[in-house]
Every structure is written in structure tokens, then in C-alpha cells.
Amino acid sequence: MATKISHLVSLLLSLLLLLLFISSQVGFTEAKRDERKKMSSPPIPSPLIPSPPIPPPPPRFYVPPSKSRRGKGP
């Protein structure tokens, strides 16, 4: 009877240690993920300093001026 109890106690202690180990690993992984999010996210701009306006993008294709009399085509 005493051996069954000691085996049960050792099993419960092993399961408890396993649970603690897994929970610590999950917490460590979440902390790393949060740290990476902070590093990759852009800094929060200060409301006192306005950001400069973004210039419009350049045109994609160069269209030369028309050489025809009607103004259409090349």
C-alpha cells in the first residue's frame, strides 16, 4: 500500500514539474513575441510635432509630348 502511494506521489510531482516547465516555456515565448512586436512596430509620433506631408508618387510611365497635328498619337 505504501509503495502505491509513493508511486502516486512521484507521478503527481512529475506531472506538476512538467506543467510548470511547459507554462514557463509558453510565457517565455509570449514575452519574446511581444518584444519583437515592439521592435518592429513604428514609433508613435508625437502629437506636438506634425509629420511632413507625403509627396505624391512619381508617374509610372513617361509619356512624351505628341508630335502629330491633332494632338493624338506619336
UniProtKB/Swiss-Prot annotation:
Membrane-traversing stretches: none
GO terms for cellular component: apoplast; plasma membrane
Chain residue ranges for the region called Disordered: 29-74
Main localization, broad class: membrane
Motif (SxS motif essential for MIK2 binding): 66-68
Family per similarity comment: Belongs to the serine rich endogenous peptide (SCOOP) phytocytokine family.
Subunit composition and interactions: Interacts with MIK2 (via extracellular leucine-rich repeat domain); this interaction triggers the formation of complex between MIK2 and the BAK1/SERK3 and SERK4 coreceptors, and subsequent BAK1 activation by phosphorylation.
Protein name: Serine rich endogenous peptide 16
Gene: PROSCOOP16
